[in-house]
C-alpha cells in the first residue's frame, strides 16, 4: 500500500458505508462533522433516531476486524462531537445511538476500492462519559 492509500481507503470506506446505509433505509444528514479535533464520519437518521456512525475500513482482517479499532478513547471523541452536533442542530432532543460500520475492502485501479464485506453494528457503544 503506498503512502496515499490509507487516506484513500478511509475515504472510499466512508463512501461505501454511506451507500450501504442508504440501502438500509438510513437518511444521511451530514458527513465528516468536525468539532475541534473530534470527527464523526456519518450522521444519519434511522427513522426518528439520530445515528452517529464511525466507519472503519481495512484492506484485510489480519490485524483484527475493523470495528475492533473503535477504542474507548475513540468512543469518547465521537461522543464529544455528537454532543456538539446536538447542541448546534435543530433536532431538539432526539433518540440517539452510536453505530459502527466495519468494512474490508480490496484496492482496484484509479484509487477505488471494492468492499469484500460490510457489517453494521447498530448501537455499538454508549457514551462512555455518561456512565
UniProtKB/Swiss-Prot annotation:
Single annotated GO MF:
nucleic acid binding
Matching InterPro entries, A to Z? Restrct_endonuc-II-like, tRNA_endonuc-like_dom_sf, UPF0102_YraN-like
Q: Specify the superkingdom.
A: Bacteria
> So what family is this one in?
Belongs to the UPF0102 family.
Name the UniProt record assigns to this protein: UPF0102 protein Cvib_0014
- What organism does the UniProt record list as the source? Chlorobium phaeovibrioides (strain DSM 265 / 1930)
